[in-house]
Amino acid sequence: MESLKEPVATVSAQIDRTHYRTLIKTDNHSFISDEPVTIGGADTGPSPQELLLASLGSCTAITLRMYIDRKMWIVESIKVNVELFEIEGATLIERQLSFEGELSDEQKKRLVQIADACPIHKMLTGKIVIETGLT
């Protein structure tokens, strides 16, 4: 896919001999990802699955906040809960939204639609191509 040479985001993940603690670096941040103790990790950071859900949850919350602010609706807080399930060989992600503020039922229905417009939602539900190579 030669036309996709300008990255939107770049992340590196590096792991040494410590099971399964992984150093994640972005342009401006670094943090740890790990696996739970039950599968051999030390639980020193979120698991890869939790990071994926965090991406969807934070993107959803940010998208909703931008929309709510543009509409000048009175909303004190937005909470997005995201859960991952594996059912019969398929992956299911459930996302629940809750709002603290003055919203009508119609506004809440609109916000459910807006949640589906967040870039990470679109990415996860759209066509994804992953190319793996060596450096």
Give the residues covered by each predicted segment.
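Extended beta-strand/beta-hairpin segments
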Residues: M1-L53, R65-T135
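Alpha-helical metal-binding/catalytic segments enriched in His/Glu/Asp
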Residues: L56-T60
